[in-house]
């Protein structure tokens, strides 16, 4: 039996593609060490995105492949996760205790943006990340309801300055709804709304988050511009439906984020298909393939396509979104895929950003 060497192990690893980074572990820069002791091989990999529900199966697949090498009787692959801080706007200082800010936005209301934001935050937490969600939809805050936080709940104040977020389902939650009467409408002009958003972002005592998901109000107005100019966003997720009108407004959202140099991580298509609960007939009530066309048009990824489902609505309204209510369901698995893709896209966006040139000034 011939002895195994490092090159042979690396060759095996290069044959397997991480489905979220779209690269093999070595090309993606995930390899940390290869230790060969006779016929035993130990490999250490490190992922830069939350993948708690994925990495054990991934490690087992790679381990079996390495054990297929001649000269190897046993192999062990350990995969750890280290989530780094990323931001698109270099000139904006980072938020205290927040590594990555993800904006969830839509061009128009009624497309399931808030439900997507809630399930994304919960899915990231299930993958092992430390997560918070900020309800920036100041005119129509709904995250308190979706996270099952009782009406009238108020955040504690720390050091007479900081709002302490309310924890629910393992996610830290902050919303303007916690500071106002639920029955009182927010009749505010743009500058007041923008100021309130900044106060919520900068004066909430988040506890060392890997990801802060911001549920944006629909449209392309003052709050979106404030976010781009004042908050260090890592990337945006655009939520739409296949309907032509929704896609038209979603395009405006994509264009807006691009103009302010915030990368669009991808598109989520809600209400893609309705499946009859009685006969199982599938019907595209709002059109077909709209999210895919939008993603293709702008060269971004279709991160998820979700059906029109009464359960998604009922579970969110009941304070336990699908990821919590039915964690093993097919729809919950789509949200987990979404979470892993979002985390991986942030890593890939950072890698694709060109470095600033080194400028040397001399007297020669």
Predicted regions and their residues:
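Switch II (G3) loop of P-loop NTPases
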Residues: 155-157, 176-191, 200-224
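Extreme N-terminal, non-catalytic leader segments
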Residues: 27-30, 35, 47-105, 339, ...
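C-terminal boundary of histidine-terminating zinc-finger modules
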Residues: 318-329
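Glycine-rich phosphate-binding loops of nucleotide-dependent enzymes
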Residues: 174, 216, 229, 337
